[in-house]
Amino acid sequence: MKGRNYPLGIQTFENIIRGNYVYVDKTALAYQMVHENKYCFLNRPRRFGKSLLVTLLQAYFEGKQELFKGLAMQQLEHEWLSYPVIHLDISKGKFYDMASLHATLDSLLADYEARYSLHVEYEKAYNVRLQNIIKAAYAQTGREVVVLVDEYDAPMHDSMKSPDLQEQIRNAMRNLFSPLKGEERHLRFVFLTGISKFTQLSIFSELNNITNISMLDKYSDICGISRNELVSIFKADIRELANENEMTYDEALSELQHHYDGYHFSGRGEDVYNPYSLFNTLASNEFDDYWFSTGTPTFLIDFLQEKHLDMLDLDDITATADRFDTPTEKIIDPVPVLYQSGYLTIKAYNPRSKIFKLGFPNTEVKTGFSNSLFRYYAPDNLGEKDALYAAYYDCLVEHDDMEAFIPHLQTFYKKFPYTLVNNNERHYQAVFYTCLLMLGADIRAEVPTADGRIGMLLFTKKSIYVFELKYEHSADVAMQQINQKNYAIAFAEDGRKVYKVGINFSADRRCIESWKVIPC
């Protein structure tokens, strides 16, 4: 039985502390941030702890010293002054029309107008109302004002499919934030969070002294949970997870890493786990796709299809730092949005060339994203997918029998609607790769070796499968390439059985025509 409470669905620092929920101490980084900067921006994926950080800052600036007992902030802060805090949580609304935006902003501003005895004048522009609130808070308390804006970009994301609506929303939001520069002398600290950096809102051009800490090494783990934090704080929880799943401690830790670790938000920063998925797993003792199941923007999947991009395109992407700053308002390149949304992360960084390598952070994201993308390939009958998963689990997971599994895959291909089949080699490779990812397989594509690139590799606990996929040739031709290039020799010392798998796809049949599975 769990001896502690996990803050599932609780994002407010004060509620977490007073409710005796698990809290991983980030107060030292928060203290450093507010004492090194006056204007800060942080972007992180959804459900990654941004709101918790914002409410932590609110509690700190409101001087609630009792909430920080035993935390790093207690030793770092000596004065504990109380400042007026304006906390605008933009995520409270859904912004599918201008009426929704006006209702949300009116409600947020009216709360503070009432607090400082200002007459609520809905007809006034948002910038005037926010400016009046800042001035009143400063005049009535004698202290500089703190402005915390959580999910500032929520209206922009909700209106992504409607350019005209987004333009109206952009103008309204630009107007709202404009006093943050003019009222600088009345402000102690300004902090904005979001998923994306919407450059055309003018926040980043008008507030020319704003510090974007999103990709700074020293703040890389200000949200999320590092490996050191995991093993030092949650050791007993991991042991219980291991016992419930009939694993050793090391196996459970490895499985957590495989599923939920792998996020890097700077070139040389800390490697972090997704806190939402991690807490759900430890609370339930079940490995599952918790974060991904909370929602994938359909516009991203649609955009990838429009640009004819697939899962093979999204791993091992090369990017410069400039690519991360591409304006999100007009999505020409999906990579910045995929990175900011948490579907891609930094896998490697070369400080000399300043080149980043991007890829999927972990199994949860890779499998979940392939599942979302696969609906463009899959048969309409959802039961077919379930049948394929059952075959995969029985043939490969339980019995390591590729020869028995491929006929099930062949049957699945045969049921694809003709409208979803592009008759070319790349299409069949992408579908094969995406399908196995969706099933949860540890599969890798285009793996470099000294003699070329292995088409695909599939790893199980007992075996390694070396694939070569051909189109309008034969399984013999595919097998011949594996042998000529000595692809399998790289795994001779692995300890697992190694199999060579040659597969040929037919244009006429639009599916797998022939295959060979040969042990090394």
Regions found by a protein language model. Give the residues of each.
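Phosphate-binding site recognition
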Residues: 1-424, 439
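Active-site metal-binding core of divalent-cation-utilizing nuclease and nuclease-like domains
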Residues: 137-141, 433-461
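Structural motif
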Residues: 146, 463-465, 499
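Mg2+/Mn2+-dependent nuclease catalytic core
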Residues: 166-171, 471-488
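Metal-dependent nuclease catalytic cores in nucleic-acid-processing enzymes
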Residues: 176-183, 336-344, 433-437, 441, ...
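Conserved catalytic cores of phosphodiester-cleaving nucleases, focusing on short active-site segments
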Residues: 432, 456-471, 485
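Domain-level recognition of nuclease-like catalytic cores that cleave nucleotide substrates
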Residues: 490, 494-520
